[in-house]
Amino acid sequence: MAFNMDPKKCPMPTQDPNVRNKNFEEVALGYTAEMAVNEAKRCIHCKNKPCQTGCPVGIDIPEFIGHVAEGDFEAAYQVINRSSSLPAVCGRVCPQESQCEGKCTRGIKNEPVGIGRLERFVADWHRENVHTAPIVPAPNGHKVAIIGAGPAGLTAAGDLAKLGYKVTVYEALHVAGGVLMYGIPEFRLPKAIVQQEIDGLRKMGVDFECNMVIGKVLTIDELMGEYGYEAVFVGSGAGLPRFMGLPGESLKGVYSANEFLTRSNLMKAYLPTSKTPIRTGKKVAVVGGGNVAMDAARSALRLGAETVYIVYRRGMAELPARKEEVEHAEEEGIIFKTLCNPVEILPGEDGFVRAITCIEMELGEPDASGRRRPIEKKGSEFTMDVDTVIMSLGTSPNPLIRSTTPGLETNRHGCIVTEGDEGKTSREGVYAGGDAVTGAATVIKAMGAGKAAAKAIDEYIRNK
């Protein structure tokens, strides 16, 4: 097979920025088969597979890419499916540039192989062309409960179901999917794709109990007692939003990014028939610089805002959001106000947001995170007229589970403490992973935690 030594990735087709910023349809349109084969031939099949070491779920990346290069897309899917239960999701939202693609040898001098784009292509091809029922393993007679139907919980559920466990997933919201459903906009991750992944788990025998808030409706002790579960996996995520404690933060027109995106993504607040409409306003300031901030800003634009600012205390180079998401936001007309930080949100006579006062920042010496610390420039305050403020400053785990589970150790941030990478907690038979343990992180890292915990749960039950 001849290699393709083009220094750049095959470009991803996308909607025109001036069209897509007015709709919620997916921005990236995906590779054609010809594009996928051509991009796959850029892989030089390193013997030590550095890309695989960057994948939290351990996909054999050179093997699946080799099948793509040969045009055998179903074989490529089967390789991915051995390690990942959500390839169509990961191909769209994982930060490949800091994981698998960040380890790619081609990326040392040129652009890395488009691993994420190829994973998405393979998953979409399988979804559209293969309609066989999943293999349901014989029951092994054991029951496991999963708390939370997000990436960690879905992955653990899938891996345990493949081993014959009777798995029930308890989800607090009215639909399964967790952050994949409520946190990531349709234009980045179509919900039909997430739903199809969940439907696949149902076909494998996984049960989903929605509107079940563990810690209120039931406790972990009850699940392991009268309900008879031999182990419980806590993958309840981190959905408690953080704020800055600014004057004016309680004004009407101030949202957490969590609430704003949940209303838009899960409750379809952009439809005229929505029972939970969002008052977006005409000028919106989004405080923060991560992927969630980009999602909130780009959603606000699509909801009718005329001007949307990203307010971030460091510079463009320090933005934690994926490079691709920043580029898409810039193309769509989002204005980046970097090296500034809000100090007050000002009210109008009607009690709604009227403006936001910020102070200019400069970068000092590196802090504990390794990034240069932002320092206020005295006397540099300025005010921007805005009528909506969205705070995107991260999230913490909900305290319900830790407050209703005696003996479950948590740290000062409210995250569940686990031993090693297997997710074992201070309570026997209780495992945890994903954002409930790490705080807000990536989808693929949560999946990796769910996968490791499923393996540990299987060993625990078999050795009881």
Identify the residue ranges that each predicted region occupies.
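Feature captures the FAD/FMN-dependent oxidoreductase FAD-binding
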Residues: 75, 138, 143-147, 195-246, ...
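Rossmann-like dinucleotide-binding cores of NAD(P)H-dependent redox enzymes
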Residues: 169, 173-203, 207-208, 297-344
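FAD-site-proximal beta/loop scaffold in flavoenzymes
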Residues: 250-281, 366-440
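N-terminal Rossmann-like FAD-binding beta1-loop-alpha1 element of flavoenzymes
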Residues: 142-168, 293-301
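Glycine-rich dinucleotide-binding loop and its adjacent helix/turn
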Residues: 122-138, 196-216, 241-303, 411-421, ...
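A conserved FAD-binding loop/helix module that cradles the flavin
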Residues: 436-464
